[in-house]
Structures are given as structure tokens and as C-alpha cells.
Amino acid sequence: MSNPKNKKEKTFLGIDYGQRRIGLAYAASPLFISLPIGCIEAGNTVEATAKILFNIIQERSVSCVVLGNPIPMQKGQKSALQEEITKLSSLIQESCGVEVILWDERLSSAQAERMLKGDCGLSRKKRKGKTDTIAATLILTSFLESSPPKIFLKKTCPKPPVR
């Protein structure tokens, strides 16, 4: 089995960002299967949340972050949550030097909620936090399934922006 600490491997962190909770999923070579890794509490600010995520990115030697982007159903509108996600993306790129991909996450939380409620029969209280983790897994899976094979062979990631 591969060693996730090997910096030459392509590793992915999927993030379902929320203002209270953040769901996380992870994938690494050789299989690139999206696995849920849990849910964390968001920081009081986007900057505080970026610091929390920085530690996870470093700990898991992540080379690419797939950050769920809640694109509104009606074009032309940008939500406050999207503004935070754009800021978080920039902070992660600047502090970690990893590639961040904003990925359409429309309805991922609703799909996760249906899965947990219908298939698993979990109560609302037991679904808390699990929905975010499953949504992160769905976001990362969607990205991995739609990506060309060459992305998995890429050994290096973009350098952080020069200040």
C-alpha cells in the first residue's frame, strides 16, 4: 500500500465548507477512492478556519484541495458563502502552496442528507456532522470521476503565489 507521507504522490482533500461545520474527505494513490475523514468545527473567521485546514493539509501531505463551491441555481448571483469560499481558497493557496480547485457542489448536502435519512434511517441529531462529511466525499468523488487520467500522474503542484 502507498505511503500518504510520500510528497511525490498526488493526494486530494475534499472540503464541504460551512460556517459552523466543515466536512472532509481524502483520496490518495494508487486507487484515488474518496474516503470520509470526518467533520471539524469552523473557526470564528475565515482566517482561523484556514489555519485549522492548514494543519490538516500538512499532516496528510495534501497536494490538491477540492473545495466545494455552492454555485447558485440562478446565474449572476454570488452568495456571502461563495465570497468566504473564494477567500478561503486564496488563503489556502498562499499559506500551503497547494493547488485549490473550486468544484460545483450544488445539492451535495441535500444528496448526503437523503442518503443518511433514507438509506441509513438516522435521526436528525445523529445526522449532524455526518451530512457534511458525506457531502465532502461526494464533492471529491465527483471531481475524481470527471478528471482526466493525467491529473493523477502529475507529481508537482503549482508554486505558491510570489508576494
From Swiss-Prot:
Disulfide bonds: none annotated. The keyword Cytoplasm applies. Keywords: Cytoplasm, Hydrolase, Nuclease, Ribosome biogenesis. Its main location: cytoplasm. GO terms for cellular component: cytosol. Its EC number is 3.1.-.-. It is found in: Cytoplasm. It comes from the Bacteria. GO terms for biological process: rRNA 5'-end processing. Pfam families: RuvX (PF03652). InterPro entries: RNaseH-like_sf, YqgF, YqgF/RNaseH-like_dom, YqgF/RNaseH-like_dom_sf. GO terms for molecular function: nuclease activity. The keyword Cytoplasm applies. Belongs to the YqgF nuclease family. Could be a nuclease involved in processing of the 5'-end of pre-16S rRNA. NCBIfam families: RNAse_H_YqgF (TIGR00250). This is Putative pre-16S rRNA nuclease. It comes from Chlamydia caviae (strain ATCC VR-813 / DSM 19441 / 03DC25 / GPIC) (Chlamydophila caviae). The lineage of its organism: Bacteria, Pseudomonadati, Chlamydiota, Chlamydiia, Chlamydiales.
